[in-house]
Design a protein with these regions (language model features):
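Glycine-rich phosphate/pyrophosphate-handling loop used in enzymes and phosphotransfer proteins
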Residues: 1-183
Length: 183
């Protein structure tokens, strides 16, 4: 996907957005890397809406192979789905990130709990970036020196992934990267 960007939007081996996050002292070196498979265009927006909001769980099958291949290339101790709030989980009936992992025939490990419940999709980029941490570590979990991959459906601003990564890094995680279906 990086090769599709104009040169103005690339800084070395990262996109402008990741570069911008790294320029902020409080977020630098929080997330090691993100892999997104598809461009978040109108088609994918509609497909993901069917998946997340209308319960078309089978759509996860479309992305399972990409996720499995990406994660099999790395030494991973934990594959962590981005958690939903209890309210969102009740609305949808499933966690779309966890479903993506399961459909890839991998084992999700729920290390994080969401402690902030407002919908991210209703917030501006600045509001998302300025949030207090929205995650906490599950009790009695040791991630010290572990390599972790976060899985989410859509990378919009990177805020959700970076908050999750910051929580894991604060607990001693060695390496935290992410995989998203679309960006």
């Amino acid at each position: 996907m990086l090769e599709e960007l104009k040169e103005d939007y690339i800084h070395g081996t990262v996109c402008h957005d990741c570069f911008r996050w790294e320029q902020q002292d409080s977020w630098a070196n929080t997330l090691d890397h993100n892999i997104s498979f598809y461009k978040y265009d109108t088609f994918l927006k509609n497909l993901m809406a069917r998946y997340k909001y209308r319960g078309d769980y089978a759509i996860a099958d479309l992305f399972a192979k990409d996720i499995k291949i990406a994660l099999s290339k790395s030494k991973v101790d934990y594959i962590v789905p981005i958690p939903l709030s209890e309210e969102r989980l009740l609305e949808r009936g499933f966690n779309q990130s966890e479903a993506l992992i399961r459909k890839a025939m991998l084992k999700p490990t729920n290390l994080l709990v969401r402690i902030h419940t407002e919908k991210q999709s209703k917030k501006s980029r600045k509001e998302r970036m300025d949030l207090d941490n929205i995650f906490q570590l599950q009790q009695a979990v040791n991630v010290k020196d572990k390599n972790i991959f976060l899985v989410d459906d859509i990378y919009t601003t990177g805020s959700t992934l970076r908050h999750a990564s910051k929580t894991l890094r604060s607990a001693g995680a060695n390496y935290v990267s992410s995989v998203t279906v679309a960006r």
